[in-house]
Amino acid sequence: FLRGAFALCAGLALVPPGQAQETQPDAAASAPKPEAKPRDPNKGSETNLPIPRYVTLKGSEGNARRGPGLTHRIDWVFTRPGMPLRVTAEYEHWRRVEDSEGMGGWVHYTLLSGVRSVLVTQDLAEFRDSPDPNAEVLFQAELGVIGRLLACTTDWCRISTDGEKGWVRKTALWGVDPDEVLE
């Protein structure tokens, strides 16, 4: 046995330095590789949904972390159920989100919902009967009220909050883009 092992080692030593032993080419390695399609920077790498986009906090609390993973420290805690959040990045099961004030971090996707909501950003927002500045005012909502987004035209959004529905000027809301139209 020792002679065979010695002969093998001696045979390997005969290969001149800097030269590799011949190998058979791998058919898969020599096959043409398909071109990778460039990733759309306006789509999420995990979901292929638009980036940025708006989502809603599902529960009563959501930890926003410094990075995408449980080992990263918690920088912020969202505490308003239904709060609209803007997704700005994706990494595996994590979404980078921010609120209306730009606060945020990485949140696990299970804490978020695709149901849309908006935040009233004016002291008093008038909810009207139709998307018209002369339409009857049904009620008013104070700064910070969260409502469910039902529809949007170019200038108005139909919102539901506390069982009431009405049309609000888009400029009085956060959670919908200025050019966004929803039917």
Where would I find each of the regions flagged by the language model?
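Short, low-complexity, intrinsically disordered N-terminal peptides in bacterial proteins
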Residues: 1-5, 21-23
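Bacterial N-terminal signal peptides
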Residues: 3-13
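Sec/Tat signal peptide C-region and signal peptidase I cleavage site
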Residues: 16-20
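SH3-family beta-barrel domains
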Residues: 22-66, 77-81, 88-91, 98-103, ...
